From Swiss-Prot:
This is NADH dehydrogenase [ubiquinone] 1 subunit C1, mitochondrial. GO terms for cellular component: mitochondrial inner membrane; respiratory chain complex I. It is found in: Mitochondrion inner membrane. It comes from Pongo pygmaeus. Pfam families: NADH_dh_m_C1. Belongs to the complex I NDUFC1 subunit family. Keywords: Electron transport, Membrane, Mitochondrion, Mitochondrion inner membrane, Respiratory chain, Transit peptide, Transmembrane, Transmembrane helix, Transport. Accessory subunit of the mitochondrial membrane respiratory chain NADH dehydrogenase (Complex I), that is believed not to be involved in catalysis. Complex I functions in the transfer of electrons from NADH to the respiratory chain. The immediate electron acceptor for the enzyme is believed to be ubiquinone.
Length: 77
């Protein structure tokens, strides 16, 4: 297969998007709004951070229990 045949689909991906012709509507069919960065949802932020802290504490606690169990089973303690 010729290299130019392989590069043709890649060049299509890199080409700029074509705008619709005059008879088609140029208006977007989807409404896109800006995210509300100036006014964060503090309930969601608190829930996310609380969940993260809980999972890290649980992970470290479980790890320490696993280490103690490993030492007990192998006679290291």
């Amino acid at each position: 297969m010729a290299p130019s045949a392989l590069l043709r689909p890649v060049s299509r991906l890199l080409a700029p998007a074509r705008l619709p012709s005059g008879r088609a509507s140029a208006r977007s069919k989807f409404y896109v709004r800006e995210p509300l960065n100036a006014k964060p949802d503090w309930l969601k932020v608190g829930f996310t951070l609380g969940t993260t802290v809980f999972l890290w504490v649980y992970l470290i606690k479980q790890h320490n229990e696993d280490i103690l169990e490993y030492k007990r089973r192998n006679g290291l303690e």
